[in-house]
Amino acid sequence: MKINLSIMLRLAALVAATAILGGCVTRQPYDYTAFKEARPASILVLPPINNSPDVKATYSLMSQATLPLAESGYYVFPVTLVDETFKQNGLTTPNDIHGVPVNKLREIFGADAALYINIKEYGTKYIVISSETRVTAEARLVDLRTGKTLWAGAATASSAEGDSGGGGGLVGLLVKAAVRQIIETAVDQGHPIAGLTSNRLLSAAVPNGILHGPRSPRYQKEGASAK
Protein backbone atom coordinates (compact mmCIF):
# COMPACT_ATOMS: atom_id res chain seq x y z
CA MET A 1 0.00 0.00 0.00
CA LYS A 2 1.40 3.39 -1.03
CA ILE A 3 1.46 6.23 1.43
CA ASN A 4 0.42 9.61 0.10
CA LEU A 5 3.27 11.87 1.25
CA SER A 6 1.22 15.03 0.73
CA ILE A 7 -1.54 13.80 3.05
CA MET A 8 0.99 12.73 5.68
CA LEU A 9 2.63 16.16 5.62
CA ARG A 10 -0.73 17.89 5.95
CA LEU A 11 -1.66 15.72 8.92
CA ALA A 12 1.69 16.41 10.57
CA ALA A 13 1.22 20.15 10.06
CA LEU A 14 -2.29 19.97 11.50
CA VAL A 15 -1.08 18.13 14.60
CA ALA A 16 1.75 20.63 15.08
CA ALA A 17 -0.61 23.59 14.70
CA THR A 18 -3.04 22.09 17.19
CA ALA A 19 -0.25 21.61 19.72
CA ILE A 20 0.95 25.18 19.26
CA LEU A 21 -2.54 26.61 19.65
CA GLY A 22 -3.11 24.48 22.72
CA GLY A 23 0.07 25.80 24.29
CA CYS A 24 -0.94 29.39 23.57
CA VAL A 25 -4.28 29.24 25.37
CA THR A 26 -4.25 31.86 28.12
CA ARG A 27 -6.20 31.75 31.35
CA GLN A 28 -8.97 34.33 31.56
CA PRO A 29 -8.48 36.91 34.35
CA TYR A 30 -10.73 36.37 37.36
CA ASP A 31 -13.49 38.93 37.96
CA TYR A 32 -12.63 40.46 41.33
CA THR A 33 -15.41 43.06 41.39
CA ALA A 34 -17.28 41.55 44.35
CA PHE A 35 -14.01 40.84 46.18
CA LYS A 36 -12.84 44.46 45.88
CA GLU A 37 -16.20 45.79 47.01
CA ALA A 38 -16.30 43.52 50.08
CA ARG A 39 -12.70 44.15 51.23
CA PRO A 40 -12.60 41.27 53.75
CA ALA A 41 -9.99 41.57 56.50
CA SER A 42 -10.64 38.37 58.44
CA ILE A 43 -11.23 34.84 57.15
CA LEU A 44 -12.85 31.87 58.87
CA VAL A 45 -11.55 28.57 57.44
CA LEU A 46 -14.24 25.91 57.77
CA PRO A 47 -13.29 22.23 58.14
CA PRO A 48 -12.98 20.93 54.55
CA ILE A 49 -15.47 18.40 53.23
CA ASN A 50 -13.52 15.23 52.46
CA ASN A 51 -14.47 13.28 49.34
CA SER A 52 -11.41 11.03 49.54
CA PRO A 53 -11.16 7.69 51.40
CA ASP A 54 -8.42 9.04 53.71
CA VAL A 55 -9.86 10.19 57.05
CA LYS A 56 -6.81 12.38 57.73
CA ALA A 57 -7.53 14.66 54.80
CA THR A 58 -9.82 17.20 56.49
CA TYR A 59 -7.55 18.34 59.30
CA SER A 60 -4.37 17.85 57.29
CA LEU A 61 -5.50 20.42 54.74
CA MET A 62 -7.26 22.69 57.23
CA SER A 63 -4.18 22.98 59.44
CA GLN A 64 -2.14 24.17 56.46
CA ALA A 65 -4.69 26.55 54.96
CA THR A 66 -4.09 29.34 57.47
CA LEU A 67 -0.46 30.08 56.55
CA PRO A 68 -0.88 31.14 52.89
CA LEU A 69 -3.92 33.22 53.85
CA ALA A 70 -2.05 34.93 56.69
CA GLU A 71 0.95 35.56 54.44
CA SER A 72 -1.43 37.09 51.91
CA GLY A 73 -2.48 39.71 54.46
CA TYR A 74 -5.52 38.36 56.32
CA TYR A 75 -6.36 37.62 59.93
CA VAL A 76 -7.21 33.91 59.99
CA PHE A 77 -9.09 32.39 62.92
CA PRO A 78 -6.99 29.70 64.68
CA VAL A 79 -7.91 26.14 63.67
CA THR A 80 -8.18 24.90 67.27
CA LEU A 81 -10.47 27.77 68.26
CA VAL A 82 -12.72 27.21 65.26
CA ASP A 83 -12.94 23.46 65.82
CA GLU A 84 -13.71 23.81 69.53
CA THR A 85 -16.32 26.51 68.95
CA PHE A 86 -18.20 24.33 66.47
CA LYS A 87 -18.11 21.38 68.87
CA GLN A 88 -19.54 23.53 71.66
CA ASN A 89 -22.39 24.40 69.31
CA GLY A 90 -23.07 20.73 68.52
CA LEU A 91 -21.46 20.74 65.07
CA THR A 92 -18.92 17.96 64.56
CA THR A 93 -18.92 17.15 60.83
CA PRO A 94 -17.76 19.34 57.91
CA ASN A 95 -21.02 18.76 56.03
CA ASP A 96 -23.08 20.09 58.94
CA ILE A 97 -20.73 23.04 59.40
CA HIS A 98 -20.89 23.96 55.70
CA GLY A 99 -24.66 24.03 56.05
CA VAL A 100 -24.68 26.71 58.76
CA PRO A 101 -26.24 29.97 57.48
CA VAL A 102 -23.69 32.71 56.78
CA ASN A 103 -25.39 35.15 59.14
CA LYS A 104 -25.02 32.61 61.96
CA LEU A 105 -21.29 32.18 61.24
CA ARG A 106 -20.96 35.95 61.26
CA GLU A 107 -22.79 36.12 64.59
CA ILE A 108 -20.62 33.44 66.24
CA PHE A 109 -17.17 34.43 64.94
CA GLY A 110 -17.51 38.00 63.69
CA ALA A 111 -15.49 37.11 60.57
CA ASP A 112 -15.80 39.04 57.32
CA ALA A 113 -15.60 35.95 55.09
CA ALA A 114 -15.59 32.16 55.31
CA LEU A 115 -13.54 29.74 53.24
CA TYR A 116 -15.35 26.60 52.07
CA ILE A 117 -12.96 23.84 50.95
CA ASN A 118 -13.86 20.61 49.18
CA ILE A 119 -11.18 17.90 49.01
CA LYS A 120 -11.50 15.91 45.79
CA GLU A 121 -8.37 13.72 46.13
CA TYR A 122 -6.04 12.85 49.01
CA GLY A 123 -3.70 9.91 49.35
CA THR A 124 -1.42 7.47 47.56
CA LYS A 125 -2.47 5.48 44.52
CA TYR A 126 -0.73 2.60 42.71
CA ILE A 127 -1.33 2.86 38.97
CA VAL A 128 0.17 0.05 36.84
CA ILE A 129 3.88 0.99 36.90
CA SER A 130 3.72 4.15 38.97
CA SER A 131 2.69 5.33 42.39
CA GLU A 132 1.85 8.86 43.45
CA THR A 133 0.41 10.82 46.34
CA ARG A 134 -2.02 13.42 45.06
CA VAL A 135 -4.07 16.11 46.79
CA THR A 136 -6.70 18.09 44.90
CA ALA A 137 -8.99 20.68 46.44
CA GLU A 138 -11.53 23.34 45.49
CA ALA A 139 -12.34 26.44 47.52
CA ARG A 140 -14.87 29.28 47.72
CA LEU A 141 -14.49 32.49 49.71
CA VAL A 142 -17.92 33.73 50.80
CA ASP A 143 -18.79 37.14 52.27
CA LEU A 144 -20.52 36.44 55.60
CA ARG A 145 -22.22 39.84 55.49
CA THR A 146 -23.97 39.33 52.15
CA GLY A 147 -23.60 35.64 51.25
CA LYS A 148 -21.90 36.51 47.95
CA THR A 149 -19.07 34.39 46.59
CA LEU A 150 -16.02 36.64 46.43
CA TRP A 151 -13.60 34.16 44.89
CA ALA A 152 -13.36 30.51 43.84
CA GLY A 153 -10.45 28.34 42.73
CA ALA A 154 -8.94 24.88 42.57
CA ALA A 155 -5.46 23.40 42.87
CA THR A 156 -3.65 20.07 42.89
CA ALA A 157 -0.20 18.79 43.83
CA SER A 158 1.45 15.41 43.35
CA SER A 159 4.52 13.58 44.59
CA ALA A 160 5.12 12.48 40.99
CA GLU A 161 5.76 16.01 39.72
CA GLY A 162 9.03 16.07 37.84
CA ASP A 163 9.43 12.29 38.08
CA SER A 164 11.22 11.07 34.95
CA GLY A 165 10.54 7.41 35.72
CA GLY A 166 14.17 6.27 35.46
CA GLY A 167 15.44 2.98 34.02
CA GLY A 168 15.49 -0.61 35.21
CA GLY A 169 12.89 -2.05 32.86
CA LEU A 170 9.31 -3.01 33.60
CA VAL A 171 10.13 -5.15 36.65
CA GLY A 172 12.26 -2.38 38.10
CA LEU A 173 9.48 0.16 37.62
CA LEU A 174 6.93 -2.14 39.27
CA VAL A 175 9.18 -2.71 42.27
CA LYS A 176 9.95 1.00 42.53
CA ALA A 177 6.26 1.90 42.42
CA ALA A 178 5.34 -0.71 45.05
CA VAL A 179 8.09 0.41 47.43
CA ARG A 180 7.18 4.04 46.90
CA GLN A 181 3.53 3.36 47.70
CA ILE A 182 4.44 1.53 50.92
CA ILE A 183 6.70 4.37 52.07
CA GLU A 184 4.29 7.16 51.15
CA THR A 185 1.36 5.40 52.81
CA ALA A 186 3.32 4.60 55.97
CA VAL A 187 4.56 8.14 56.56
CA ASP A 188 1.40 9.96 55.37
CA GLN A 189 3.05 11.65 52.43
CA GLY A 190 -0.31 13.27 51.83
CA HIS A 191 0.33 15.88 54.55
CA PRO A 192 3.25 17.69 52.86
CA ILE A 193 1.52 17.36 49.48
CA ALA A 194 -1.57 18.96 51.05
CA GLY A 195 0.69 21.84 52.07
CA LEU A 196 1.72 22.35 48.45
CA THR A 197 -1.91 22.24 47.36
CA SER A 198 -2.87 24.81 50.02
CA ASN A 199 -0.15 27.20 48.86
CA ARG A 200 -1.19 26.88 45.23
CA LEU A 201 -4.84 27.30 46.11
CA LEU A 202 -4.78 30.06 48.73
CA SER A 203 -1.75 32.23 48.03
CA ALA A 204 -2.27 35.70 46.62
CA ALA A 205 0.95 35.23 44.66
CA VAL A 206 -0.57 32.82 42.11
CA PRO A 207 -2.51 33.79 38.95
CA ASN A 208 -6.25 34.18 39.62
CA GLY A 209 -5.66 33.57 43.33
CA ILE A 210 -7.17 35.55 46.18
CA LEU A 211 -6.30 39.23 46.43
CA HIS A 212 -3.87 40.53 49.04
CA GLY A 213 -5.48 41.44 52.35
CA PRO A 214 -5.20 44.67 54.41
CA ARG A 215 -2.21 43.35 56.40
CA SER A 216 -0.15 43.02 53.23
CA PRO A 217 1.96 45.88 51.79
CA ARG A 218 0.53 44.89 48.40
CA TYR A 219 -3.07 45.50 49.53
CA GLN A 220 -5.13 47.08 46.73
CA LYS A 221 -2.04 47.18 44.50
CA GLU A 222 -2.80 44.17 42.29
CA GLY A 223 -1.98 44.56 38.63
CA ALA A 224 -4.05 43.98 35.54
CA SER A 225 -4.65 40.30 36.42
CA ALA A 226 -6.69 41.36 39.45
CA LYS A 227 -9.01 43.66 37.52
Segments predicted by a language model, with ranges:
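Bacterial N-terminal signal peptides that target proteins for export
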Residues: 2-13
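Solvent-exposed loop/turn segments at secondary-structure junctions
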Residues: 50-53, 82-86, 120-125, 156-160
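N-terminal segment of the mature soluble domain
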Residues: 52-116, 148, 152, 177, ...
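C-terminal/domain-edge helix-coil "capping" segments
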Residues: 24-41, 144-227
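Surface-exposed short loop/turn segments
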Residues: 94-150, 160-172, 176, 215-227
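Post-signal peptide N-terminal segment of mature Sec-exported envelope proteins
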Residues: 33-56
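Alpha-helix termination/capping residues and helix-transition junctions
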Residues: 18, 37, 108-111
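C-terminal motif of bacterial Sec signal peptides marking the signal peptidase cleavage site
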Residues: 19-23
